[in-house]
């Protein structure tokens, strides 16, 4: 499965806003994992590199960050931005995450890896898991932020149109081989690869109107329906009902709940 949300400029900008909203949670996870100055870290499914830039600043000039993604436009953007930001310790490489890892990466020498919202888009997780296993040294940490229940994305009260949209997204991703509840499968898979789960927590959030997490959900509700309509799985009448429901929510006391995101920190044994 490819990244079904697209790699156009609108999605790039949305990813930037998304990273800002979830930046504190990412940095807290890196603290727990002990990512520090001088480390050599992988950013798996780095996209345009918003997390990579933060990781590069964390490891400093004595460290190294390698972003890996299968979108040529995102890799180009990341490398251009790394040069502009004067981050020579950061570079990105184009890699098919559904294929074998190159020997230059799979050398058992990396100190850690960061992976957020990637596993849910992969039809087959085995190549990624093999890449992680063959890249990290013993004792290295893998930090994952992936969804365990995407259908918790909801609006209360009067969220029928949002619920219909959420169900449409789930079916659309599953039809392309994705798994929006992938975090539930990761413990068994990573245990088989010789990893130990050392820390985990829920990052599910509930938020009122105007809260940054509510704005994040509204941002997605604004940007993604156009692609579902283009793919023929979401109608203009459904979109009109969704927009009316969001407008009503903004004019009343409403509670937004995010998809159930789970943090897992694993150590290679």
Outline where the language-model segments fall.
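Class I SAM-dependent methyltransferase Rossmann-like catalytic core
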Residues: 2-22
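A short acidic, Gly/Pro-enriched loop at the edge of an enzyme's catalytic core
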Residues: 102-112
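Conserved alpha-helix/loop element of class I SAM-dependent methyltransferases that forms part
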Residues: 20-39, 54
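A short SAM/SAH-binding and catalytic strip from SAM-dependent methyltransferases
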Residues: 111-126
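Conserved catalytic/acceptor-binding region of the Class I
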Residues: 143-211
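Class I SAM-dependent methyltransferase SAM/SAH-binding core
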Residues: 42, 48-102
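Conserved Class I S-adenosyl-L-methionine
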Residues: 180-181, 198-269
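A short glycine-rich, Lys/Arg-flanked "PGG" loop and its adjoining helix->strand segment in the class I
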Residues: 126-141
């Amino acid at each position: 499965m490819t990244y079904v949300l697209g790699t156009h400029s609108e999605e790039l900008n949305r990813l930037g806003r998304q990273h800002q909203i979830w930046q504190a949670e990412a940095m807290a996870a890196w603290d727990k994992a002990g990512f520090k100055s001088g480390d050599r870290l992988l950013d798996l499914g780095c996209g345009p590199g918003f997390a990579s830039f933060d990781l590069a600043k964390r490891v400093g000039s004595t460290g190294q960050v390698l972003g890996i993604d299968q979108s040529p436009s995102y890799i180009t953007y990341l490398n251009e931005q790394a040069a502009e930001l004067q981050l020579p310790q950061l570079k990105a490489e184009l890699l098919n995450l559904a294929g074998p890892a190159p020997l230059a990466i799979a050398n058992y020498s990396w100190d850690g890896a960061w992976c957020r919202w990637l596993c849910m888009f992969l039809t087959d997780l085995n190549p990624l898991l093999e890449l992680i296993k063959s890249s990290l040294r013993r004792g290295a940490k893998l930090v994952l932020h992936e969804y365990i229940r995407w259908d918790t994305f909801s609006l209360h009260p009067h969220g029928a149109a949002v619920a219909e949209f959420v169900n449409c997204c789930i079916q659309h991703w599953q039809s392309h081989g994705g798994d929006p509840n992938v975090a539930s499968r990761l413990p068994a898979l990573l245990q088989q690869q010789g990893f130990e789960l050392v820390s985990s927590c829920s990052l599910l959030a509930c938020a009122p109107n105007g809260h940054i997490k509510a704005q994040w959900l509204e941002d997605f509700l604004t940007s993604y329906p156009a692609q579902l309509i283009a793919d023929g799985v979401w109608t203009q009448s459904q979109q009109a009902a969704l927009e009316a429901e969001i407008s009503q929510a903004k004019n009343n006391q409403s509670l937004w709940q995010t998809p159930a995101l789970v943090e897992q920190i694993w150590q290679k044994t």
